[in-house]
Amino acid sequence: MAALMTRRFAQIPEITKLMEECQSMGIKTLGPDVNESYRVFGVNEHGEIRFGLSAIKGMGAPAADAIVAERLKNGPYKSIFDFAERVDYSSVNRKAFETLALSGGFDSFGIRREQFFGKNNKGETFLDTLVRYGQLFQQEQHEAANSLFGGTEAIEIATPPIPDAESWSTIERLNRERELVGIYLSAHPLDEYSIILNSLCNTHCSELGDKQELAKKEDVVLGGIITGVRSKFTKTGKPCGFVTLEDFEGSGELALFGEDWGKWRGIM
């Protein structure tokens, strides 16, 4: 499955379907991690699929390759500051740092994602000061190596403080993650409702397109989170809507017409 994802890593919708299939089969799919992910999708020692760095939306292959190459050459990144000190800035820019922070690529360092966007008393985000710190560290390191003393002294530059930041809501954090990796990986917005959904629902959202199976049921009960709404008009010019619902097993689309669409469109 990891190999199939790799072949389609440029097709986010296809990857999303494959990851949903993995989840339904009980195969754990983990988000990106700078200390375990490779450029493409892979399988870790526990048999879990690890998201490939270059499959993150907005993360280029050169940045992914540079991160992995440095890790393989000099060992795992010990902290976010160690990462900033070692990464190749000719390939890994600020946008790559931001993408990794939002997608969970830095989660293993124990820093909450929102803290990367917290500001100091100068109005600078931790993300900006972190990148600047790393670039300055490497500049000083280069100058020391080319000095008369041969760079024998350790580089001493103060690391930027990690700010406190107001916690994002679970849905905000997960939505930002989903925008970049195509699926909820670290958690699911419906986790706290899992017992209710499993007890009451007899249909998964992914089954909405199977009209024959739905017709066999006396009642159709399902639950999920709305992830998309499209407004359209019928051939006769009447308004209608198509709502994308997602649960733990996948997603499906529900069509609403007439009074139903008029009743619900204002709150979706």
Each predicted region: which residue ranges?
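Noncatalytic, beta-rich nucleic-acid-contacting surfaces in large DNA/RNA-processing enzymes
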Residues: 1-268
